[in-house]
């Protein structure tokens, strides 16, 4: 074990994954980080393998994907692993963010960790969108056309930006080439950002815990206790992912994407992948194109205001009943937005979308600070009454 403490590289690994002291009371909700790292490794390995057989051209992109599925040894497995792990990646990220919101992981001294996490999330969305375009089925082509066209909402220079992104006057070879190049390189940028996320956590105060208090009173080394704990969820994740990959590989996809891209025929409904539906619903709920685009981006960036709008005195909401109610309303509203994103743009879905959008933004800028102030006032009143009773007796 001495070499782990003396060798410069091994000493670094030792401080992060062997001797790193963790609060003894952290639950399985703190296992999402290791699961996300595992997902990223799967995505990079399967993605690089798929890139060896993919041809980023308008004429051959769809055929090269079919070639991977039919002719490459275990190509179907690699592709389905890549597609379904992408969904699992976002699902676990949403759970990870939900846990962060519940337990106040955004509060000082972990504000930098939260900020880096939001940047990682934005980059994940960009990477997922670029990858969705590559198979060049109907949904790929029209999804790329619709989403890149959002840039045209920018006054004066919008259309020029769209044509710059396309490399022409419509989605063409240049578009697929640049999307492929970016989709290939961004996961490595994600890996670097994930490392920065980990360093920021390590150098601030380490992991939080379910009580929201300092974990310095009782800590355990990462190995073997938390390595074993992480392995349990990793093996459960492999089991769950295998069920999707082997028994229902296309359940989260769109059948329209098995039709070769046709610029002359628009699909009945242009719908993104399920994990982007809430933001798509926010985009569509605002009639003005520019305001819709701003709202969609703001829906992600607004996560950065949480360290400033949460005025509660305790970290997390586990002991704050009013904040708990607001939190669960927010989760329900987010799921409603996800459902509305898959619906046609017609009444009553438009009206429901507008109500849900207002509630979504209200949670961050109105509900959280207001509920925090009410709870602080109730605590102060209770303390005042307690002190008054003590003085009486």
Curated annotation (Swiss-Prot):
Cofactor remark: Binds 2 heme b groups non-covalently.
Amino acids binding heme b b566: 96, 197
Coiled-coil stretches noted in the UniProt entry, renumbered to this chain: none
Chain ranges passing through the membrane: 32-52, 76-98, 113-133, 179-199, 226-246, 290-310, 322-342, 349-369
InterPro entries reported in the protein's UniProt record: Cyt_b/b6_C, Cyt_b/b6_C_sf, Cyt_b/b6_N, Cytb/b6-like_sf, Cytochrome_b, Cytochrome_b_C_euk/bac, Cytochrome_b_N_euk/bac, Di-haem_cyt_TM
Keyword terms, alphabetized: Electron transport, Heme, Iron, Membrane, Metal-binding, Mitochondrion, Mitochondrion inner membrane, Respiratory chain, Transmembrane, Transmembrane helix, Transport, Ubiquinone
Membrane topology: Multi-pass membrane protein
Keyword Transcription: no
GO cellular component terms listed in the entry, alphabetical order: mitochondrial inner membrane; respiratory chain complex III
A single MF term (Gene Ontology): ubiquinol-cytochrome-c reductase activity
Keyword Membrane included in the entry's annotation: yes
Compartment(s): Mitochondrion inner membrane
Cofactors required: heme b
Free-text function comment from the UniProt entry: Component of the ubiquinol-cytochrome c reductase complex (complex III or cytochrome b-c1 complex) that is part of the mitochondrial respiratory chain. The b-c1 complex mediates electron transfer from ubiquinol to cytochrome c. Contributes to the generation of a proton gradient across the mitochondrial membrane that is then used for ATP synthesis.
Other comment: Heme 1 (or BL or b562) is low-potential and absorbs at about 562 nm, and heme 2 (or BH or b566) is high-potential and absorbs at about 566 nm.
Family affiliation: Belongs to the cytochrome b family.
Subunit structure, interactors included: Fungal cytochrome b-c1 complex contains 10 subunits; 3 respiratory subunits, 2 core proteins and 5 low-molecular weight proteins. Cytochrome b-c1 complex is a homodimer.
Protein name: Cytochrome b
Source organism of the structure: Venturia inaequalis
């Amino acid at each position: 074990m001495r070499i782990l403490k003396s060798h410069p590289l091994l000493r670094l690994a030792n401080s992060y994954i062997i001797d790193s002291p963790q609060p003894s009371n952290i639950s399985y909700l703190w296992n999402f980080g290791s699961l996300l790292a595992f997902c990223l490794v799967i995505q990079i390995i399967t993605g690089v393998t798929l890139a060896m057989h993919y041809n980023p051209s308008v004429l051959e992109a769809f055929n090269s994907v079919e070639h991977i599925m039919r002719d490459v040894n275990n190509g179907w497995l690699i592709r389905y692993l890549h597609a379904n792990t992408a969904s699992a990646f976002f699902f676990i990220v949403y759970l990870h963010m939900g846990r962060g919101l519940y337990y106040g992981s955004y509060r000082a001294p972990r504000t930098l960790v939260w900020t880096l996490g939001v940047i990682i999330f934005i980059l994940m969305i960009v990477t997922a969108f670029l990858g969705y375009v590559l198979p060049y089925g109907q949904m790929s082509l029209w999804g790329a056309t619709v989403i890149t066209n959002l840039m045209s909402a920018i006054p004066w220079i919008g259309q020029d930006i769209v044509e710059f992104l396309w490399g022409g006057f419509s989605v063409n070879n240049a578009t697929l080439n640049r999307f492929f190049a970016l989709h290939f390189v961004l996961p490595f940028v994600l890996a670097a950002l994930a490392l920065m996320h980990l360093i920021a956590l390590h150098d601030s105060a380490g992991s939080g815990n379910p009580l929201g208090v300092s974990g310095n009173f009782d800590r355990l080394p990462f190995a073997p206790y938390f390595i074993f704990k992480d392995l349990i969820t990793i093996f459960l994740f492999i089991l769950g992912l295998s069920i999707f990959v082997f028994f229902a590989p296309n359940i989260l996809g769109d059948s329209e994407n098995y039709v070769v891209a046709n610029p002359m025929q628009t699909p009945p409904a242009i719908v993104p992948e399920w994990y982007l539906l809430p933001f798509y619903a926010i985009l569509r709920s605002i009639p003005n194109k520019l305001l819709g685009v701003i709202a969609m981006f703001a829906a992600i960036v607004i996560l950065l205001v949480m360290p400033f709008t949460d005025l509660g005195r305790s970290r997390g909401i586990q002991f704050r009943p009013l904040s708990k109610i607001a939190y669960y309303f927010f989760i329900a509203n987010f799921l409603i937005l996800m459902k509305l994103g898959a619906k046609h743009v017609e009444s009553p879905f438009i009206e429901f979308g507008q109500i849900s959008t207002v509630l979504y933004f209200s949670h961050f800028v109105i509900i959280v600070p207001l509920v925090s102030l009410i709870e602080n006032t109730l605590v102060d009143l209770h303390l005042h009454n307690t002190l008054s009773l003590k003085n009486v007796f």
